[in-house]
Regions:
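Extended beta-strand/beta-hairpin segments
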Residues: 1-47, 55-139
Length: 139
C-alpha cells in the first residue's frame, strides 16, 4: 500500500490511496487546536482496529458460509497525556439477531477478531477492550 499525504494547512491533511484514488482528510481534534471536523489521526488508529476486526472476521465468515452483513461496531478512544497518546480503545460489536451461530463458530470468529493484524500491531501499552454482543442488532 502506498499513500500520498499532503498537509493542507490549519492542522489538516489529505491522504490519497494511490491504487484507488480514494481520499480521506484528517483534522486535529478540538482539544488540540483543531476544528474537529474530520477524523483525527488517533481516531483513524481506533477506526483501523475496528474495521480490521470485522474485515478479518468477515473473511473467515465467508469461508464458513456465514453472513455478517448488518454487524455494527461502536468504537471509543481514550486519550492520555504527557505524552499525549491513545491509552485505550473500547470496541463493541453488535451482531444481527437473525444470525444464529453455534458457540464453536462464535469462538472461531472472536479469536480471528482478537488476533487481527492491527490488533497485533498496536503497542501493548494501549489497552484494548473488545466486546462481542451476539444477537444485539435488530432490524
Amino acid at each position: 500500500m502506498t499513500t500520498t499525504i499532503i498537509y493542507t494547512g490549519q492542522l489538516r491533511c489529505s491522504a490519497t490511496h494511490n491504487q484507488s484514488g480514494t481520499v480521506i482528510e484528517t483534522d486535529a481534534p478540538t482539544d488540540n487546536r483543531g476544528k474537529g471536523e474530520r477524523f483525527s489521526p488517533t481516531d483513524l488508529l481506533c477506526v483501523s482496529l475496528g474495521t480490521c476486526i470485522i474485515t478479518t472476521m468477515g473473511i473467515r465468515a465467508i469461508d464458513m458460509g456465514i453472513n455478517l452483513d448488518g454487524t455494527t461496531l461502536q468504537v471509543q478512544k481514550h486519550m492520555l497525556g504527557d505524552p499525549r497518546r491513545v491509552g485505550g480503545i473500547d470496541i463493541t460489536l453488535g451482531f444481527p439477531a437473525s444470525l444464529q451461530l453455534e458457540e464453536k463458530d462464535r469462538l472461531i470468529l472472536q479469536r480471528i477478531g482478537d488476533n487481527c493484524p492491527v490488533q497485533k500491531s498496536i503497542h501493548p501499552d494501549i489497552k484494548t477492550n473488545i466486546v462481542y454482543n451476539w444477537g444485539a442488532v435488530t432490524a
